[in-house]
C-alpha cells in the first residue's frame, strides 16, 4: 500500500445480536415494572405531583453528568465493562427504592441509578460496532422489540402484582430482573472492539465543548435536534401519564390506578412488538429512514393533541395508538440516521450525547409536566407534548413528500 494512501476504515465485526436483545429485554422488563407505579408510589409517601415527577428529573440530572463520560470510557475499554457497571447501579437503585421508608429515600435510589445509567446507549453503541450502516435501522429495531415486549409484559404484571401483593413487589421483581441482566452480560455478551482514537481528555471533561463539536456538523446537528424534541415530548408524556390518567379517567367507577395504567402501557408495548418485530425493516426499505421519522412526528402531534381532548377510554386508546406508532418508528430510524452521520470511532461519544440529551429533556420536561398537572392543566400538559413534536415535524422537512416535491420544482426552475 502506498504510504500516502489512508488506511481503509475498519469494518464492523459481525456477531450475533441475540445476547444484546436478551440483555436489553431483561433491563427494559425491570424498568417497565417500575414506570407505571413510580409516581403513584411516590404519592404514598405524600408527594405532590411535582415532587413525584421530579423523581424522573433527579435521575436524569445524574444521567446528564455521566452520559458522555460513559460513552468516552466505553470507546476506550469496550462496551461490556461499562455495561456491567451501569447494570449494577440499576440493581442497587431498585433495592433502595423497594426498602424506602420516606420520600427522600426514593430520591437517593434515583440518584444511585442515574449516576451509572447508560444501558441503552451502550447497547446501541455495541450494535453500531457490529452492523453495517444499511442494516442499523433494522438492528436498532431489536431494541424497539425489547421495549415493546418489556412494555407489554412489565406494566401488565405490575398492575396485577401491585393490586394483589402491594406496590413494593414489582420493585423487588425489577431488582431480580436487573440481577439476571448482569449475569447475561457477564456470560453471554462478547467483548467488542476498543477504539484506538486518541480522545482529548480535556474535551471529555468539558462536555459542552463536545456538544458544540457535534452540533456544529451539518446534517448531524438537525438529527440531534430532532432527537432532543422527540425525547422531550416523550419524557413529558411518560413522566406525567400516570398522574394525568389518575385525574382524568375512570374505569368501572374508580380512578385509574397502577392496574389500569399498566394495561395501557401493555397495549402500547404490544403495538411496539408488532411494528418493530416485522415492519420496521420493510418500512425503511420502502420509504427510507428520513420519511419514517417525519411520519412518526406527525403521528405524535395528532396522538398527543388527541390525548388532551379525549373524554373516554376509547378515545384515549385511539390517541395512544397514534403516539405508539410515532414513538415506535422514530426511535430506531432516527438513531440509525444519527450513527450514520457520525464516524465509526465516534459512535460511542455521539450515542453518549443522545443519552445526555435524553437526560436534559428528562430534567426539564417532568418539572414542567408536574407543575401543569398540579394546577389541573391536563389539556395543556398533553398539548405541550404535541407542540414539541411539531418542532420535530419542522425539522423533518426532507422527509416530507410535499417538501421534496417543492425542492425538486425549485431546482428545475431557471
Mark where each language-model region is:
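C-terminal transmembrane helical hairpin of 12-TM major facilitator-type secondary transporters
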Residues: 290-334
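Juxtamembrane intracellular "pre-TM" segments in multi-pass secondary transporters
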Residues: 5-14, 191-225, 414
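Short amphipathic helix-loop junctions that connect adjacent transmembrane helices
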Residues: 36-49, 240-260
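Structural signature of the two symmetry-related core transmembrane helices
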Residues: 81-96, 175, 291-305
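Helix-to-loop junctions at the C-terminal end of transmembrane segments
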Residues: 67-77, 275-288, 373
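Helix-breaking motifs and short loop linkers at transmembrane-helix boundaries and internal kinks
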Residues: 46, 78, 99-104, 309-311
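Cytoplasmic helix-loop-helix junction between adjacent transmembrane helices
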Residues: 109-148
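Conserved MFS/SLC helix-loop-helix module at the cytosolic interface between two early adjacent transmembrane helices
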Residues: 65-101
